[in-house]
Regions:
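Conserved acidic donor-binding segment of nucleotide-sugar-dependent glycosyltransferases
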Residues: 332-343, 351-356
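Carbohydrate-associated surface elements
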Residues: 41, 164, 185
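Nucleotide-activated donor-binding/catalytic signature segment of Leloir-type glycosyltransferases, i.e.
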Residues: 260-280
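A conserved mid-protein helix/loop that constitutes part of the nucleotide-sugar donor-binding site
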Residues: 19, 215-238, 249, 256-262
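Aromatic "clamp/platform" in nucleotide-sugar-dependent glycosyltransferases that forms part
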Residues: 300
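Short alpha-helical donor nucleotide-sugar binding micro-motif in glycosyltransferases
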Residues: 279-280, 287-292
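N-terminal subdomain of nucleotide-sugar transferases
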Residues: 1-45, 49-57, 403-422
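Short hydrophobic beta-strand element within catalytic cores of glycosyltransferases
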Residues: 317-320
Length: 422
């Protein structure tokens, strides 16, 4: 197949969607398919196309939210290039700029469209509402309407990564069409101990000031309100109060609230047991998993939580807050533990760090618990959905054009012009 992935996030930008899209590209190519990526670049004026990697980047302007950039929803300069690919299917990975572009192209040039819903937008509305109760309620209703519109009216098939997102659409949004649950896979071999430079891991532990008997909990993610970082700091404050000085917490990642949490950590006098490392290259992530003993997260806004799968691939037991997003990955007392509040979290953190027998038992069962997240399984599950999308597209009757006819009239006259990438 010739497949087009449209996304607003792609490396070098680091987040869950970016990782998922890059992983999907790699997995599909490993199965013999040709995969193109259309994404937003880091420059405000430059178009670029990597002929070897099949990655097309359009200009983008900073939004002022993390490192996100906004692009034109119909960048004319790249239309001819994309048409030359003769795509069999378009797979949208976003509801925003490149997602709208994907929908317009799919409709205008009669290409089947698959959409994956990656982000629990209802958990992020406070960025707009600033936690104003009634405004936030309105924002959540708008998110519900737009989410249903994108997934119901504009896509031939619809993918979600977890049962949590499935229930959001079925139970809260009352979405009645077929939903395909396809968890993102990972290249677990990257995290195998034999493929990691353990000498470098030892050097990193030493540089961070960790002693041989220190039990290090690792969190990897964005330093922002939705990741519930304050919860982790409160847990560490209680652990310090209990004089468990060998328990440490390392937080890897950047974000809008990093300085706020760093200040809070100092106010709570946790500098001896908590470290904020900042962002780290994706290629170095296996090193961080292996310098820790276990993974810890209190985030309740995940659609899937790829970092949890990565931790399990590195044979690290996972302690996570009770949330449906983690239920398909973590089994209590098998490869990790669940907690509901700070006191339970503290209790389990201490238990795992002191009960060597239980720790080794959980560790032993980590890798076997993520076999279903292999790259091959991921690619073939998505390919099955593509086949359904193509069948649905070929069998359906014409449907309302919404804004597509208007766009077609505006831009069809430009098709024969030469648009060259700079």
């Amino acid at each position: 197949m010739r497949i087009g992935l449209f996304t607003d996030s792609y490396p070098p930008y680091i987040n869950g969607v970016s990782t998922s899209v890059e992983t999907l590209k790699y997995a599909l190519e490993a199965e013999g398919h040709i995969v193109y990526v259309v994404t937003v670049g880091q420059d405000a004026t430059t178009y670029s196309y990597d002929e070897e990697k099949h990655i097309l980047k359009v200009p983008g302007l900073p939004l002022g939210i993390y490192d996100y950039r906004a692009a034109s929803i119909y960048p004319l300069k790249v239309i001819k290039k994309i048409r030359s690919w003769n795509l069999d299917v378009i797979h949208s990975q976003t509801e925003l700029c490149m997602g709208i572009f994907a929908r317009l192209l799919a409709k205008q040039y009669h290409i089947p469209l698959v959409h994956t819903y990656h982000t629990m937008y209802k958990d992020y509305t406070y960025y707009v509402s600033r936690n104003h109760k009634y405004f936030d309620m309105g924002c959540k209703k708008a998110v519900e309407y737009l989410s249903k519109f994108y997934c119901d009216n504009t896509a031939d098939t619809f993918i979600v990564p977890t049962i949590k997102t499935y229930h959001l659409f079925r139970d809260e949004y009352h979405y009645n069409k077929e939903i395909y649950i396809v968890p993102t896979g990972i290249d677990s071999s990257r995290f195998n101990r034999e493929n990691v430079d353990m000498l470098k891991v030892g050097e990193m532990r030493k540089k961070l000031g960790y002693k041989k008997n220190d039990f290090v909990y690792l969190f990897v993610g964005r330093m922002a309100q939705e990741k519930n970082i304050l919860f982790l700091l409160e847990a560490m404050e209680e652990i310090k109060r209990k004089k468990k000085s060998n328990i440490k917490l390392l937080l890897v990642g950047d974000g809008p609230d990093k300085d706020l949490y760093d200040k809070k950590m100092k106010e709570m006098e946790l500098t001896d047991c908590v470290k904020f490392f900042g962002s780290a290259p994706w290629t170095d992530m296996p090193l961080y998993y292996h310098l820790s003993q276990a993974f810890l997260t209190a985030s309740v806004t995940e659609t899937q939580g790829l970092t949890v799968i990565e931790a399990l691939a590195a044979e690290k037991p996972v302690l996570c807050i009770e949330d449906e997003a983690f239920h398909t990955m973590v089994v209590d007392k098998l490869n990790g533990m669940f907690f509901n509040d700070v006191s339970t979290c503290v209790k389990e953190m201490i238990e795992l760090s002191t009960n060597k027998k239980e720790y080794n038992l959980l560790k032993k069962q980590t890798k076997s618990s993520i076999k279903s997240y292999s790259l091959s399984s991921f690619a073939n599950s998505v390919l099955d959905v593509y086949k359904v999308a193509i069948d649905n597209f070929n069998n359906k009757k014409d449907f309302p054009n919404i804004v597509h006819n208007t766009v077609k009239k505006l831009f069809d006259k430009k098709e024969d012009e030469e648009w060259k990438l700079s």
